[in-house]
């Protein structure tokens, strides 16, 4: 992990406020620019499932299992704080704000137009541009025994 990445993710893992214009805020905007570039490639046409896996791996900075499937369009304003298990399906028009962390477990299906947000703007009008990380979001599959 790059030094700036570590600095950012250590900071947000402590749920400290990200002040507008701060070094952490600037890093976050750099992640967003990178994510926009990669999601344009993910969303740009007829990628094979393997190509989508490779692009999503590049977006997250982690190896994504070949069983991963995604129907574009897909949006994120970070990408580097998403982890994905096996047999994950993300349907179209989802938007993940993953700066605070998003862990998607095995066998998870995510429906159309799902928004997952891990940051929130402060309510104070004078500090509205500041944000607070809300911690890691966990998406899990609940396996049930349907045998009678």
Language-model segment annotations:
Residues 1-65:
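Terminal amphipathic alpha-helical/low-complexity segments used for targeting or macromolecular assembly
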Residues 74-84, 89-148:
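Flexible, glycine/small-residue-enriched loop-and-beta-strand segment within the central core
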């Amino acid at each position: 992990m790059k030094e700036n990445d570590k600095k950012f993710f250590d900071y947000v893992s402590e749920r400290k406020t990200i002040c507008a214009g701060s070094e952490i805020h600037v890093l976050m905007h750099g992640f967003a620019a990178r994510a926009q570039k990669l999601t344009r490639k993910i969303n740009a046409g007829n990628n094979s499932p393997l190509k989508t896996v490779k692009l999503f791996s590049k977006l997250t900075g982690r190896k994504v299992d070949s069983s991963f499937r995604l129907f574009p369009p897909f949006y994120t304003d970070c990408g580097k704080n998403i982890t994905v298990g096996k047999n994950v399906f993300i349907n179209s028009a989802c938007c993940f704000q993953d700066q605070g962390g998003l862990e998607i477990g095995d066998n998870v299906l995510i429906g159309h137009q799902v928004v997952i947000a891990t940051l929130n703007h402060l309510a104070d009008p004078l500090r509205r541009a500041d944000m607070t990380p809300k911690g890691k979001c966990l998406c899990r599959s609940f396996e049930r025994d349907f045998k009678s």
